[in-house]
């Protein structure tokens, strides 16, 4: 086998709470993470020459050693003394810099793909440990199972997520949001409303999507909306079109809404497409990285 093709899925946050800050600048968080069926395709091909090449359909990501997928391949090459090279091609569908872990998901796909391609026989836990060196979201993206994430996001407790037929409307406005600046703008002593994650987990367990939708809280949202009112406007469009609930994912700028039926989600999509290009109707998922082809 010298070629492998993988699906690399996006995530949304059903809640985000920030509990404090570490000495190294990372924050202690508690959040519920949910994979969705919006994915990039990552193709990995072995090369005879000992180098790492990155190519993509997107003009918005670096194609050199600054790309997280390059770093993922380099970590495995160095750790296991691999003398072969690889070409990594990313067919981008997940919006870039959107708060949906697109880059982390791509890195997770490279770790899983090279584990198979190079027959390293690493367990999922071993891959997650390596992935944590690349980013806090990478371990979650490897498995993709809905989880309560704690610590800096690396401590994962599997939970029951949204039913797989849940209709989700996604809108990524053409805005740049600095995650660092959002966290810097957070006043932890003045948070008016925090998520009740225990209650949210119970709502997920009982598949009460209405209660889930009404209980979603992202404490980063007000900081980002303070800089970009547009995010609030998108939420209002979703709610006007019968979303059960709408919230910003991650530090933004992506907004999502949960819908009881697909027809309402599609009507909301049509309205948002009048102003925004990156609008999708997708379902929730229980999967992370998925191998969808191995070739010699």
Swiss-Prot record:
Pathway: Isoprenoid biosynthesis; isopentenyl diphosphate biosynthesis via DXP pathway; isopentenyl diphosphate from 1-deoxy-D-xylulose 5-phosphate: step 3/6. Keywords: ATP-binding, Isoprene biosynthesis, Kinase, Nucleotide-binding, Transferase. The lineage of its organism: Bacteria, Bacillati, Bacillota, Clostridia, Peptostreptococcales. It comes from the Bacteria. InterPro entries: GHMP_kinase_C_dom, GHMP_kinase_C_sf, GHMP_kinase_N_dom, IspE, Ribosomal_Su5_D2-typ_SF, Ribsml_uS5_D2-typ_fold_subgr. Its EC number is 2.7.1.148. The gene is ispE. It comes from Clostridioides difficile (strain 630). This is 4-diphosphocytidyl-2-C-methyl-D-erythritol kinase. Catalyzes the phosphorylation of the position 2 hydroxy group of 4-diphosphocytidyl-2C-methyl-D-erythritol. Gene3D superfamilies: 3.30.230.10, GHMP kinase, C-terminal domain. SUPFAM superfamilies: GHMP Kinase, C-terminal domain (SSF55060), Ribosomal protein S5 domain 2-like (SSF54211). The active site is at residues 11, 137. ATP binds at residues 95-105. GO terms for biological process: isopentenyl diphosphate biosynthetic process, methylerythritol 4-phosphate pathway; terpenoid biosynthetic process.
